[in-house]
Design a protein with these regions (language model features):
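Juxtamembrane membrane-water interface segments immediately C-terminal to a transmembrane helix
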Residues: 26-51, 64-74
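Amphipathic, well-ordered alpha-helical segments in soluble domains
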Residues: 17-21, 46-49, 53, 76-79, ...
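Extreme N-terminal signal-anchor transmembrane helix of membrane signaling/transducer proteins, especially
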Residues: 1-26, 176-180, 185-186
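Short, charged/polar, low-complexity loop and linker segments
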Residues: 17-31, 119-129
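Selective recognition of signaling/oligomerization transmembrane alpha-helices
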Residues: 158-201
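Juxtamembrane loop-transmembrane helix junctions in multi-pass integral membrane proteins
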Residues: 3, 25, 29-32, 155, ...
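Heptad-repeat alpha-helical coiled-coil/4-helix-bundle sensor or tether segments in soluble regions
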Residues: 70-131
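Extracytoplasmic
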Residues: 42, 105-166
Length: 203
């Protein structure tokens, strides 16, 4: 009986510690996935903001340099690039998936064209030719960038759902193990101890 109690205590401790560890990992994973999805969504916003600045300034043609907000454009491009760097590292290290790899690779083509054109405009604020090239690049690549980023967001969400489904299976397994453990404790420890106490009382 003593061995059974020791075994039950150790097993209970293992279940408790391991379940807490798994819960902690899943909460961290959910937070992580949410951050990835949010940053991906922000990338679409940045590309739209760059487009808005370019098209607004383009409306005034030769006077564009008096209307284009280079400070805002520079800030947006910096944020756009930093988040892209983060996504690039996360995608290559933590999302080993052919679909995300292919989508991100395609997305980078459009991203680089947008950023390179924007940076040339920022570095050459008095060049109408460079500005017009910037507008052309934006018109040719922004929609494609947003489309591939939409597909990436959808894929990240699908991966997150698959992970959640796997976590639910683990929870089910833990539930089954816990029930079996309780049956063991009741049948092999509590009931025998109860019978033993009754026997002692009768004497």
């Amino acid at each position: 009986m003593k061995k059974k109690i020791i075994f039950a205590s150790i097993f209970f401790l293992l279940i408790t510690v391991s379940s807490q560890f798994i819960f902690h990992l899943d909460i961290k994973r959910q937070s992580y996935d949410t951050k990835i999805i949010n940053i991906s969504g922000k990338q679409r916003t940045y590309s739209q903001q760059i487009t808005k600045i370019a098209l607004y300034a383009n409306e005034v043609k030769n006077l564009y340099r008096y209307y284009i907000d280079l400070d805002s454009l520079s800030t947006i491009v910096d944020d756009f690039s930093q988040d892209n760097y983060y996504l690039k590292n996360i995608t290559s290290k933590n999302y080993k998936n052919e679909t995300t790899d292919a989508l991100f690779k395609e997305n980078q083509v459009y991203f680089n064209k947008i950023v390179n054109a924007a940076n040339r405009t920022i570095d050459n604020p008095d060049s109408q030719e460079i500005f017009e090239e910037f507008v052309t690049k934006i018109k040719a690549n922004e929609a494609k960038f947003s489309a591939t980023m939409d597909n990436l967001v959808n894929e990240y969400e699908a991966i997150s759902k698959r992970k959640l489904a796997g976590f639910r299976k683990i929870l089910t397994l833990y539930g089954v193990v816990t029930v079996v453990f309780l049956i063991f404790v009741i049948w092999f420890i509590i009931i025998p101890l109860y019978k033993k106490s009754k026997t002692l009382e009768s004497h």
